[in-house]
Amino acid sequence: MSFSDQNLIWIDLEMTGLDPEMHKIIEMATIVTDSELNILAEGPVIAIHQPESELAKMDEWCTTTHTASGLVARVRQSQVSEEEAIDQTLAFLKQWVPEGKSPICGNSIGQDRRFLYKHMPRLEAYFHYRYIDVSTIKELTRRWQPEVLKEFSKTGSHLALDDIRESIAELQFYRKAVFKI
């Protein structure tokens, strides 16, 4: 184990939609890496129970995607509440990173943070206010070095743990291909 204020917390959420005022979190996962993007530990992967009334708010894309991945079935079977998911995740993170030190890391992570702020403020408060958003680097690369993007592709399973692993791999790719580090 390597507890450090230099470790990075990666998080991904799957939600019933894109509006935190209307939709809910249905899955979350975390990974901790060191500052060199080496995976140190994978946190709990949690399907969060939501009532049918919340699942009914999903649009066609969410319903199709989350049903095909098996996530909807896992959410229906889950007994884990949002508060329990927070407690499990914080117990994991506290082993690896002090509170307030790691930026929140991921792809389009601002969207995840909006949901955390609304539905899981205790967990959101554990992160530093800064972001490491891989999608920002992707958008800059698309504009400044578009040929580089042809060298990397993602599967896009829309399962939280898989998405985090892909985000880390994507940042490792940009580190070598764009930043030449």
Curated annotation (Swiss-Prot):
Keyword Nuclease belongs to the record: yes
Subcellular location: Cytoplasm
Domain Exonuclease: from-to ranges: 8-171
Gene Ontology cellular component list: cytoplasm
Function recorded in the entry: 3'-to-5' exoribonuclease specific for small oligoribonucleotides.
Highest taxon, organism lineage: Bacteria
GO MF annotation: an example: nucleic acid binding
GO BP terms in the entry: DNA metabolic process
Primary enzyme class: hydrolase
Primary site of residence: cytoplasm
Family stated for the protein in its record: Belongs to the oligoribonuclease family.
A Pfam family hit: RNase_T
Protein name: Oligoribonuclease
Claim: Transport is one of the keywords in the record: no
PANTHER family to which the protein is assigned, alphabetical: OLIGORIBONUCLEASE, MITOCHONDRIAL
Active site: Y129
Entry EC number(s): 3.1.15.-
